[in-house]
Amino acid sequence: MLNTPRICVVVIGKTLEEFLSQLEAAQTAVDFVELRIDYLEQINPNWVRIIKNHTQKKAILCCRARADGGKFLGTPEAQQEILQAGNDLGFDYLDIDLPVANKISIHEKKAKIIISYHNFLHTPPITELNFLLENMRLFNPDVFKFATKSEQYEDVKTLFKLLINKKNNENMIVLGMGEQGKIIRLLSPLLGGYLTFSSINGAISAPGQIDFKTMQDFYQRFYKISSPLKGED
């Protein structure tokens, strides 16, 4: 049986005013948002508090470093401070990248933890992805996330294989970046993926990210086609 897709809209913005405006628009569309605070030109724990006060929906707090494909230029210690503030303020999820997971330790953990791996150059072979998955398991996260550049059909197959072979008790997000990766973004939540990400008002945070309305229309049409006809034996 196919899963009901969970769509998370990504919120970005250079200024606090722009960010809060995008957040308001996202929250009118969905019940799940990802707050990419690394896009802000300035960020501090007080701004995290302001953003939390404007957040009414389930939210992932993410402060991704430039080295991991984000915009944040601060130290791991600064990341730690921001994510710790997010935990203490009551955000539902914190996204921590695998390369810095051993440098960031959340005290008195309240939020669920997503451990992420991003590769903007290519999709590694399945053996390498499985090795990374084993490394992620050492941190005992609530959700595993893989996002890789998908340029050919083999990349799509590799990512679907990773998702389909996950343990039944594990939550996993699998995303393809680029045009070829769009099919993964659409189908992975139907095949056991924890959620998929979309954009709103053209505020895209990753290659191949699909507009929320387009994604919503796809799922509505998909379920209309796949639902059995009434009265059919």
Curated annotation (Swiss-Prot):
CDD domains given in the database record: DHQase_I
Residue numbers annotated as active site: H118, K145
Alphabetical UniProt keywords: Amino-acid biosynthesis, Aromatic amino acid biosynthesis, Lyase, Schiff base
Gene Ontology BP term (one): 3,4-dihydroxybenzoate biosynthetic process
InterPro entries for this protein: Aldolase_TIM, DHquinase_I, Type-I_3-dehydroquinase
Residues of the signal peptide: none
Keyword hit for Amino-acid biosynthesis: yes
Summary of subunit composition and partner proteins: Homodimer.
Family to which this protein belongs: Belongs to the type-I 3-dehydroquinase family.
Protein known as: 3-dehydroquinate dehydratase
Organismal lineage: Bacteria, Pseudomonadati, Pseudomonadota, Gammaproteobacteria, Legionellales
Gene name for this UniProt entry: aroD
